[in-house]
Design a protein with these regions (language model features):
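Conserved alpha/beta enzyme-core scaffold
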Residues: 1-220
């Protein structure tokens, strides 16, 4: 028979678990990265979260370099010299289409959006209700993003000039997240785009960091 460990933890603490002296320190890390730039740096692409910590502290790092992985910016790079084994394989990235918004979700979204003020910084979760909320924010001004996740709907509001990130205390003029989840439209938009930055989860989801933004609004 086999055994597994169950380790309850907050998401922002997972980076520590994969750290050098963490309970989940790895013998080997297998990951997918972007093609390296002229300086040899590969981006973690869609997900920085605990990936950076796990990669930096694993005994062996095995990376698939994939030209379809977006080169996201922020604190989410690994140098090619720090990769032990490289596999070159170009595979399109799986897409996650937005959920269907029904009438109930639409009503909830409309109500929640009415509570958002100009200049607020938003955290948005996964599911139909956050998508519905985004649909009702088109009349707002200078919203900011400091969120675990960035989705297609956030890109739409950036393009409309609703999300500017100008009013944020922390990381102004940048939409901050720890991973991307959406369609090719999102991945293409985030590619080498300084308006979006991915950072490790122990930064993005840390309550002490989040609290440095005034008028923080969480919608899940």
């Amino acid at each position: 028979s086999s055994y597994g460990d169950y380790t309850p933890t907050f998401f922002f603490e997972t980076a520590k678990l994969f750290g050098k002296d963490g309970e989940l320190a790895l013998d080997a890390m297998l990951l997918q990265v972007s093609t390296p730039d002229e300086h040899g740096y590969c981006s973690y692409g869609l997900s920085c979260d605990y990936t950076k910590s796990a990669t930096e502290n694993a005994k062996i790092v095995i990376a698939q370099i994939n030209k379809f992985v977006p080169r996201t910016l922020g604190n989410c790079f690994v140098h090619i010299d720090d990769i032990d084994y490289i596999i070159e394989e170009d595979t399109p990235i799986p897409e996650v289409q937005p959920p269907v918004v029904g009438e109930i979700e639409r009503k909830i979204g409309e109500f929640c959006a009415s509570l958002v003020r100009d200049g607020d910084t938003l955290q948005l979760g996964i599911g139909a209700i956050p998508v519905a909320v985004l649909n009702f924010l088109k009349d707002k001004k200078d919203l900011g993003i400091h969120s675990e996740m960035i989705s297609d709907g956030i890109v739409d509001l950036i393009n409309l000039g609703v999300i500017t990130n100008k009013k944020k205390n922390l990381n102004p003029n940048k939409a901050i997240a720890t991973f991307l989840m959406g369609s090719k439209k999102l991945y293409d938009y985030a590619n080498d785009n300084p308006a979006i930055e991915l950072h490790p989860v122990d930064y993005v989801n840390n309550p002490i960091i989040i609290a440095q933004n005034d008028n923080m609004v969480s919608i899940n």
